[in-house]
A protein has these predicted regions:
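Conserved acidic carboxylate
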Residues: 7
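Acidic, metal-coordinating helix/loop segments flanking the phosphotransfer/catalytic sites
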Residues: 28-44
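Active-site residues of response regulator receiver
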Residues: 48
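The feature encodes the CheY-like receiver
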Residues: 52
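Short amphipathic alpha-helix used as the core "switch/output" element in two-component signaling
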Residues: 57-68
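A short, hydrophobic beta-strand element within the central beta-sheet of small alpha/beta folds
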Residues: 67-78
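Alpha4 helix (beta4-alpha4-beta5 surface) of REC/receiver domains from two-component response regulators
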Residues: 76-92
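Conserved binding/recognition cores within well-folded domains
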Residues: 103-131
Length: 131
């Protein structure tokens, strides 16, 4: 799974890097501009809300299609209600990142796996084909 991390704190980037295993392809970005300049499409964007002078929520409203799913990672729990949209799958408070990040990434990975599965209904069984 290709994961982008849009987080302006290098300390938080390192926390995320240490929590996720090496089976994921991680790309880290400090600014919205860096993220937009990348030529990749991401399965998941781990997104901070406060990015210096920029706002992650406003960014997603303007650019919803560069990633399949979004999980916000922020210390601004009061903004949680403003984050949810069709492709937002969660909100992790930074103080609880060690408890929640791996589980949430696994949930996203399972969701992607389900979306990529095609059922073939054969006469005596159902077979699944994965894209």
């Amino acid at each position: 799974m290709r994961i982008a991390v849009l987080e302006d704190s290098l300390i938080q980037q390192e926390r995320i890097r240490n929590l996720l295993d090496l089976s994921h392809r991680l790309c880290f970005f400090c600014t919205v501009e860096e993220y937009m300049e990348s030529h990749f499409y991401f399965d998941l964007l781990l997104l901070d809300i406060e990015l210096g002078s920029q706002n992650g929520i406003e960014f997603i409203k303007k650019h919803p299609d560069k990633q399949r799913f979004i999980v916000y990672v922020s210390s601004h729990s009061e903004a949680m209600a403003d984050t949810f949209d069709t492709n937002v799958l969660g909100f992790i408070i930074k103080d609880r990142i060690e408890d929640a990040l791996v589980e949430k990434v696994n949930q996203v990975e399972q969701r992607i796996h389900q979306l990529e599965k095609i059922a073939l209904n054969l006469p005596y069984e159902t077979r699944y084909v994965y894209r």
